[in-house]
Amino acid sequence: MAMKAVCVLKGDSPVQGTINFEQKESNGPVKVWGSITGLTEGLHGFHVHQFGDNTQGCTSAGPHFNPLSRQHGGPKDEERHVGDLGNVTAGKDGVAKVSFEDSVISLSGDHSIIGRTLVVHEKADDLGKGGNEESKKTGNAGGRLACGVIGIAQ
């Protein structure tokens, strides 16, 4: 049976958006789609963080969701956090249209992202290839512009 989830992104900045998730089979890929507005043109890191806690804004969401204790990487890398979804690309109008599939995240089981926080960052994620310690943890993606807790949808 297909599972669906949704995340409404908000923050202290004008950045906001809605991201949808759908997984047709429990061990199948997750389709991710939606849009984010209010961004500066270019790439912005896009990650699932460990906690669904937004009491202190996006900072209380903790580090990237990483149940396998791996180093940070890109979405197509073998070595990556479960929550490493790479970058979204905003056009001149400040809008990022999101549409991709990911086979590492899940909407159920040990790698479930339900109840965790999705974050869009101020800078591009270097996908762990930045040549310093921070790159292997965060991808040097900078501050957290907007976030939201991923919840079950109809």
Swiss-Prot record:
Subunit structure: Homodimer; non-disulfide-linked. Heterodimer with SOD1. The heterodimer CCS:SOD1 interacts with SLC31A1; this heterotrimer is Cu(1+)-mediated and its maintenance is regulated through SOD1 activation.
N-acetylalanine PTM sites in chain numbering: A2
Protein name: Superoxide dismutase [Cu-Zn]
InterPro entries with a match to the protein in the record: SOD-like_Cu/Zn_dom_sf, SOD_Cu/Zn_/chaperone, SOD_Cu/Zn_BS, SOD_Cu_Zn_dom
EC number(s) given by UniProt: 1.15.1.1
Modification after translation, per record: Palmitoylation helps nuclear targeting and decreases catalytic activity.
Chain positions with N6-acetyllysine modification: K123, K137
Keywords assigned: Acetylation, Antioxidant, Copper, Cytoplasm, Disulfide bond, Lipoprotein, Metal-binding, Nucleus, Oxidoreductase, Palmitate, Phosphoprotein, Zinc
Disulfide bond annotation, renumbered to this chain: C58-C147
Cofactor(s) required, per the database record: Cu cation; Zn(2+)
Chief place of localization: cytoplasm
Family affiliation: Belongs to the Cu-Zn superoxide dismutase family.
Residues the record lists as binding Cu cation: H47, H49, H64, H121
Taxonomic placement: Eukaryota, Metazoa, Chordata, Craniata, Vertebrata
Organism, as annotated: Macaca mulatta (Rhesus macaque)
One term under GO cellular component: cytoplasmic vesicle
List of residues that carry N6-succinyllysine: K4, K10, K92, K123, K137
